């Protein structure tokens, strides 16, 4: 896994979005709990609006502190519910691998879009044996590309247009 350090969580979400658009693969970003997680929301919303497959992984306070207004606790799953296809809170380390697998599948299947996985601090520290899928076990949809004839036809239409607009 190649990690790219950014200076702000919003930039992380935007970079993951750009990676997904450029490669056709799922973009991934991570953030700490509380304000770090909420800073991802603008980028996540952009990914939802444009059907970009993205998995955002956020930290969370320990399970025992949930609901106590602990330092940097926020209900990021509720906050992100309207701008993701699905949110997950991983309550056991045994559930982490299958949840990540489901998050990637959800991000890609049907209309692509963002998914958020929230992981409490104590779950992050648990040690378990996990089986992760092989690299090709999660099917990656083929990115459609135009044929040479269709691309030439599109170029001709643009060149012949009096007032072309490219979006």
For the regions a language model picked out, list residue spans one by one.
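N-terminal alpha/beta PP-like core and its mobile active-site loop of ThDP/TPP-dependent enzymes
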Residues: 1-167
């Amino acid at each position: 896994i190649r990690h790219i350090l950014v200076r702000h969580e919003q930039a992380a979400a935007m970079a993951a979005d750009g990676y997904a658009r450029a490669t056709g693969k799922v973009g991934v970003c991570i953030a700490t709990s509380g304000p770090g997680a909420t800073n991802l929301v603008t980028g996540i919303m952009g990914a939802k609006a444009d059907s970009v497959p993205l998995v955002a992984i956020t930290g969370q306070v320990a399970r025992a502190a949930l609901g106590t207004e602990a330092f940097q606790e926020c209900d990021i799953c509720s906050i992100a519910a309207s701008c993701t296809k699905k949110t997950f809170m991983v309550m056991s380390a045994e559930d982490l691998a299958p949840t990540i697998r489901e998050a990637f599948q959800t991000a890609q299947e049907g209309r692509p879009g963002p998914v958020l996985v929230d992981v409490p601090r104590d779950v992050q520290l648990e040690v378990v044996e996990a089986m992760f899928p092989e690299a090709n076990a999660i099917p990656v949809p083929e990115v459609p590309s135009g044929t040479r004839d269709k691309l030439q036809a599109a170029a001709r239409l643009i060149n012949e247009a009096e007032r072309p607009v490219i979006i």
